Amino acid sequence: MRIGILGQGLAGTALAWQAHWAGYSVHIFDPGSQDGASWVAAGLINPIVLKRKRLVQDAHHHMATMDRFYARVTSELKTSLFYPGPVYEVLPDGASLRAWEDLALDTAFAPFIGPCHPLPHAALQGEAMGEVLQSRRLRVPHYLAASRSFFAREHHVHSELVTTLTLGDGRVQLQGQALDVCLLAEGYPGKWTESFFGPLPFAPTRGEGLRIAWDGEPITHALHKNIFLLPDGDGRYQAGSTYAWDQLDAGASEAAREEILTKLQGWFTQAVRVENQWVGVRPTMQDRQPRWGWHPAHPHLGYLNGLGSRGALTAPALSQRLLEALETASGS
């Protein structure tokens, strides 16, 4: 069976792997631009919404599926996909430390709430840092690029924008290619998805982040308080990100830069220099729930969208569900 996948962000790449493991001939259609939301994603795999101290919906299922998925991809690609170490929450005072310890008493949170540790850098302000068990950070650009190379070698990658997509006689014509199945993984704005499935309840969020560096003692831990501070392993760090719901097409802004630096300096007093600033638009839905499914009149057309800022965590399970539905429908 020939399966076409439109888009090669976190959603499309996960779908491609699931299709590959199911034995399909995979055709990826994606221009290869590295400025999409997935390419600038921090890659945090974290079952806890740290800002609100709540669990991601279906956190336990997503974490288990994610473990198996990335282990299998790692075996296929023969490369490391993760930065070392978990994520830590910076606890500013004794009250927040006690609140963290109380979370460990909640049976839902207990598998993910780790011990508290001393702050590892003199410029960090606070009482301690709490370890988020099972958390990690995906090397997103490396994962996407290595996966693209794999599919270019073992399957088919079409580095072009899709301008023609037609349905008929139980097949799909995509850029002149006759396919048995087509999966849309466009992210925002989802042109082809909305043309076939109708309007999606998008509430896209514009995020900005900084790549920073400093002279002196490094940090090797991934940290969160009101923003993240993430070591890239080369003496540089990602700091961010912001959330905005307007001016989605605008470039990097001075306001976002100042917001990030002000928040960071509230708990990390080290003097830093900004080396780069990035912008991405997260394909978030109004209710923050992803959307996926198969077309009622065209059962060979499906889609996956709306992963928001949790794509590294949720793409494995959601892509698996979509492919399982296809296999059930086809009787394979």
Regions found by a protein language model. Name each.
Residues 1-11:
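Beta1/beta-strand and adjacent pyrophosphate-binding region of the FAD-binding site
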Residues 3-5, 26, 237:
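Conserved hydrophobic helix-helix packing surfaces used for dimerization/oligomerization
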Residues 11-22, 31, 39, 44, ...:
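Active-site substrate-recognition segment that forms the wall
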